[in-house]
Structure formats: C-alpha cells, structure tokens
C-alpha cells in the first residue's frame, strides 16, 4: 500500500524491521537500507535499470534476502514544491511496485539529496569516476536517513 504522508507510512510499519530506500532515476536506481532498529541508513548498491519486471525482481530479491519491512521512494519535487514529469514517473513506479511487493511504500521529498551526496563525496576526496559509480546509492542513503530522522522524531512525539 502506498502512503502519501510519512505519518501514515509509520503507522503501516511493524514496530521493528529494516527499510529500503530508493532513489529512482531514468537509467539507475540507487538503493540504501537501514538497520533493524531504524537508526542508520547505509548506501547499498546502484541498479542499472532495464525493464520494470527485471528491476522489480532485483528489488524483491533484496527485500527478501534482508527481511525488509517497508519501502521509501524519493519523490523528486520541483524547488517550488510542485510535481513534474519525474515525480509522476516515480508515482507510476510505486504503483507498479506495490503490485509485486506487498510492503508499505512511503514517499520522501528528495530535493537536493543528490547535491548533498555529491558534496559529501567531494569532501571525502572521492574521484570523479568513483563519484559517478556511487552517487545514486549515496543519494538513496541521504533520502532514507531523512526518513529515519523524521520517524525517530515522530516516535518521540508519540511517547511524550
């Protein structure tokens, strides 16, 4: 099931279990995962996109291997908050993915996540070639960590 708000997404998740974060591009999908306590996001890999069925099979295998309980998709909004063709494409991907992966799906605003990932890689003195190889899954890690920080804050609010 797809959840528009992060609060709805949190309510749909089991109390524990790792999540997968996706940074969807036209040619690649950046993948990051969390630990079971949902404290830290770790960039995992970049999938070179082919057909949806093959991409979905790869994601299904990763979620099964790692026992993941939810999916976070970066939603590429414009700087004014509106949604363009890339956001519509992401929503279509989520609808298709929800048909083959019965896990809660939540969206997270991914504005500037790739910029932040690029800056972090430059600060770490990563070569251009290496940055090109890892940028998508590092961006997925930024997206997923943003969600984890928000979920942590919401959890503290509930218990206050």
Swiss-Prot record:
Pfam family, one: RuvX
EC number: 3.1.-.-
Matches recorded under InterPro entries: RNaseH-like_sf (IPR012337), YqgF (IPR005227), YqgF/RNaseH-like_dom (IPR006641), YqgF/RNaseH-like_dom_sf (IPR037027)
Location in the cell: Cytoplasm
GO BP terms: rRNA 5'-end processing
Single GO cellular component term: cytosol
Enzyme class: hydrolase
GO molecular function: nuclease activity
Domain of life, per lineage: Bacteria
Alphabetical keyword list: Cytoplasm, Hydrolase, Nuclease, Ribosome biogenesis
Role description: Could be a nuclease involved in processing of the 5'-end of pre-16S rRNA.
Protein family according to the UniProt entry: Belongs to the YqgF nuclease family.
PANTHER family per the UniProt record, alphabetical: POLYNUCLEOTIDYL TRANSFERASE, RIBONUCLEASE H-LIKE SUPERFAMILY PROTEIN
NCBIfam families, alphabetized: RNAse_H_YqgF
Name under which the protein is recorded: Putative pre-16S rRNA nuclease
Natural source organism: Cereibacter sphaeroides (strain ATCC 17025 / ATH 2.4.3) (Rhodobacter sphaeroides)
């Amino acid at each position: 099931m797809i959840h528009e708000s992060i609060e709805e997404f949190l309510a749909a998740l089991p109390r524990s279990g790792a999540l997968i974060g996706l940074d969807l591009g036209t040619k690649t999908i950046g993948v990051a995962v969390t630990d079971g306590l949902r404290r830290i996001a770790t960039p995992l890999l970049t999938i070179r996109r082919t057909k949806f069925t093959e991409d979905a099979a790869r994601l299904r295998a990763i979620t099964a291997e790692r026992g993941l309980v939810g999916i976070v998709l970066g939603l590429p909004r414009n700087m004014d908050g509106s949604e363009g063709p890339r956001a519509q494409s992401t929503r279509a991907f989520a609808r298709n993915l929800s048909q083959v992966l019965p896990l809660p799906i939540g969206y997270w605003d991914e504005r500037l996540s790739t910029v932040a990932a690029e800056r972090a890689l430059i600060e770490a003195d990563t070569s251009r070639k290496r940055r090109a190889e890892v940028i998508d899954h590092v961006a997925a890690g930024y997206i997923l960590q943003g969600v984890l920080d928000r979920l942590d804050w919401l959890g503290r609010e509930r218990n206050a």
